[in-house]
Amino acid sequence: MKKTYHLCWSGGEEILFRSRRDYIHGIICLYIAAYESGSLLLAYCLMSNHVHICVRTENKKAFIKAFRYSYTRYFNSRYHRKGRIGERNFFSIEICGLYHLLATISYILRNPVHHGVCETPFGYEFSSARAAFKNEMGYALGASPASKKKHHNQIPDRHKLPPHVLMDREGLILPESIIDTADLEHQYSSVRAYQYYMNKISAEEWERRQAEDKNGKPPIRLEDIEKGIKGANMKEMLANMTSRAHHKMIGDMEL
């Protein structure tokens, strides 16, 4: 039986994604791990030194192990190194209840805003924020999808992507082709609710709504999502949600 989890893999003292190519390959590895384990991705966000994932899976350890192993092989080959990259363990929370799920996904997709690398979740390229309600929000498909054959050298050995997976011309997987968007849109129920959660300031109201799940679980808070991330500053992250728009924000790779 599949259960829903928030999983977080931290780089610790290391940078997991040093370049645009690393992010692109990381998303490929993430999806292959989900596809081959029969897991369903609900949300993801790759930051320079950590990864947040919301996934429905029967075996969270097998899923995250496959993802890390595949990406580590790529990373070690690209940067001529050996051994493990990032923290040995990963952080996980089992998600039970609608409002716990909405809070979890919203925190994951808002992560770049919390870290001050973009002004809205929809402005960050290496997350799945723009996968849901694309038509309602007026988003085009994005860059014209390219044939996967053009990017076969980026796909890990012995793996094949199914026909429905689309890439842009750089090989970046389009999130709407790998996220369970039907489930995600059902959970949020409307584009207005989705936008509300993507932009609402983190507050006690979220905790009160989660209590309505009546599952005996404590509310999901920002500090829970960021637990284990080295250097995470809760006050600063919350301040980034309430500050005035930044005309020039530092990018994640620059950071």
Predicted regions and their residues:
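Short Pro-Cys-Gly-centered "Cys-loop" motif that presents a nucleophilic cysteine in a tight turn
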Residues: M1-A43, T57-L255
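Short beta-strand->loop micro-motif that forms the acidic, two-metal-ion catalytic signature
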Residues: N49-T57
